[in-house]
């Protein structure tokens, strides 16, 4: 046991070496204090050294003792005088020393790696609550009626889109140019009818689905209106060309025959039909006597057939 002098002016060298040994021992124990047993033994040792340091009046020894105590306390889990653990809940890098025997609050720098947060503090979610939104705008439960923004204005949504069911009365409805012109025409027509005191004709809805299916099958014109089937058939028949007439076989029979006007190129120009009552015997003699009406490739006694 070495003898210590109580003089305030000077301290022997063994005292300084003892202080250095305390620093080294405290650092080693603080670095290895990962279990509860090491922590308890370290705190008991520091309490004993704290009581021994109170007997000395030197300010240098008190400052070194306070620094060593604060350094060890920063490395180990701090406990107060009543045995309750003190949990550090902030990560600012500084902490107060509640066990300073002198009474002065010494603040020591604490690294973030040595601070252990409790389970409640460590279980905080890293992301906040996701606010529901659609195309960058808040949903209707979070946005008021006066702050509802329409995506059609910014060009985020195409021109034609289904209208929502819960539309406020004061909110505008966006339509394309064609629909807008139709709305204006209907408004003008209604205004004229109201000025003339005429009743506006209300369209009746379909009473059955079969009527709707029949309307879908009907022929429509260019404007989308229904066309009359009889007029449609007459127009088709009037537009049919004459060369679409089905071909007939021309027979040299006493009952009927067809008179043909053949052009110089051999193309049929017109067709005329006559009955046997209107034909005299001179026509038969004309066909038999005139050789220019005979075909060179066929004999005169064979029947001539022409296909249109």
Curated annotation (Swiss-Prot):
GO annotations of cellular component type: CCAAT-binding factor complex
Tissues with expression: Expressed in flowers and siliques.
Single GO BP term: embryo development ending in seed dormancy
Motif Subunit association domain (SAD): chain residues: 174-197
Keywords, comma-separated and alphabetical: Activator, DNA-binding, Nucleus, Transcription, Transcription regulation
PROSITE patterns linked: NFYA_HAP2_1 (PS00686), NFYA_HAP2_2 (PS51152)
InterPro entries hit by this protein: CCAAT-binding_factor_CS (IPR018362), NFYA (IPR001289)
Coiled coil location: none
Transmembrane segments: none
Domain of life, source organism: Eukaryota
GO MF: DNA binding; DNA-binding transcription factor activity
DNA-binding region, residue range(s): 204-229
Positions of the UniProt region annotated as Disordered: 53-76
Localisation per UniProt entry: Nucleus
Family: Belongs to the NFYA/HAP2 subunit family.
Role noted for this protein: Stimulates the transcription of various genes by recognizing and binding to a CCAAT motif in promoters.
Quaternary structure and partners: Heterotrimeric transcription factor composed of three components, NF-YA, NF-YB and NF-YC. NF-YB and NF-YC must interact and dimerize for NF-YA association and DNA binding.
Name used for this protein in its record: Nuclear transcription factor Y subunit A-6
Source organism of this protein record: Arabidopsis thaliana
């Amino acid at each position: 046991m070495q003898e210590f002098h109580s003089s305030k002016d000077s301290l022997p060298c063994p005292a300084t070496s003892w202080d250095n040994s305390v620093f080294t021992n405290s650092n080693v124990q603080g670095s290895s204090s990962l279990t509860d047993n090491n922590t308890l033994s370290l705190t008991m040792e520091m309490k004993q050294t704290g009581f021994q340091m109170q007997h000395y009046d030197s300010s240098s020894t008190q400052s070194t003792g306070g620094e060593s105590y604060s350094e060890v306390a920063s490395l180990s889990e701090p406990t107060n005088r009543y045995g309750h653990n003190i949990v550090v809940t902030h990560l600012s890098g500084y902490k107060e020393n509640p066990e300073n025997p002198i009474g002065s609050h010494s603040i020591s720098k604490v690294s973030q790696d040595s601070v252990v947060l409790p389970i409640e503090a460590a279980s905080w979610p890293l992301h906040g609550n996701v606010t529901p939104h659609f195309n960058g705008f808040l949903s209707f439960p979070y946005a008021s009626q006066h702050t509802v923004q329409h995506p059609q204005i910014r060009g985020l949504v195409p021109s034609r889109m289904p209208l929502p069911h819960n539309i406020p009365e004061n909110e505008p409805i966006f339509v394309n140019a064609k629909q807008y012109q139709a709305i204006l025409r209907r408004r003008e027509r209604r205004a004229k009818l109201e000025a003339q005191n005429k009743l506006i004709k209300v369209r009746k809805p379909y009473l059955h689905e079969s009527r709707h299916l029949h309307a879908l099958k009907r022929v429509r014109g260019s404007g989308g209106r229904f066309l009359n089937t009889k007029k449609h058939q007459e127009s088709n028949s009037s537009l049919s060309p004459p060369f679409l007439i089905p071909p007939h076989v021309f027979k040299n029979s006493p009952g009927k025959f067809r008179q043909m006007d053949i052009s110089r190129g051999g193309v049929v120009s017109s067709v005329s039909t006559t009955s046997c009552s209107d034909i005299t015997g001179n026509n038969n003699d004309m066909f038999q006597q005139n050789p220019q009406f005979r075909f060179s490739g066929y004999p005169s006694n064979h029947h001539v057939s022409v296909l249109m």
